[in-house]
Amino acid sequence: MNAFNKANDQEETLYEAVLEEISSGRLEAGQRLKVSELATRFGVSTSPIREVLRLLQGEGFVEIHPNRGAVVKQGDANTIQNIFEVLQLLEPYFVSWFADYAQPEMIEEMEEIQRKIEEVPSGNLIEFRKLDFEFHWAICRRHYNQVAADLWKKLRKALNVHGAKLRISPVRYQTIMEEHQELLEAFRTHDAVRAEAAINKHVAGSFTQMSQQMRALGL
């Protein structure tokens, strides 16, 4: 690996690490991001931290203000709605294809992820969201259209960032488990129509839960 590629890989790893801190809520909306503190936290110099913050600013996750520096951007209801409107188009596209073409080992991988989700202790939203992402990414990453898959990945990460402070009610949590099982059953029987219906319900339910919380918080 040459020096250029190594530097790019390090920047990408650092970017993912900072983004994970934001999406997990460990770096909260409105929190000031001090370059020196982040450099110490991740064991790097200040230059790559500044570059990562510029990248995060470009993607709408961070705001950089003169004399104040960088802060984690506060999510809002309009952003959440815009993301979900695109996901409502992408998700059926992926699951209908997966229902038609998924091999047994692909479905088994999803079943294993779902087992892990169901074992997550109540209230551990960081681990739950990580595994929920993996569950859906197991569908998207195998699709032939990687442009669409990369767009989905970007939107889901954005959703996790903007919704980091939101909670999942016990009722919604149970519904998510049931909807995941409904998807798995549709995949096992290669029923694309059933899979589309399940994912449409799943996405709509998540949007309702998140948008209601956003409005309640005045965002």
Task: Give, region by region, the residue ranges found by the protein language model.
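Mobile beta-alpha loop/short-helix "lid" or hinge segments that flank ligand
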Residues: 58, 62-63, 155-157, 172-174
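Alpha-helix N-cap/N′ positions at the starts of helices
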Residues: 67, 90, 112, 175-178
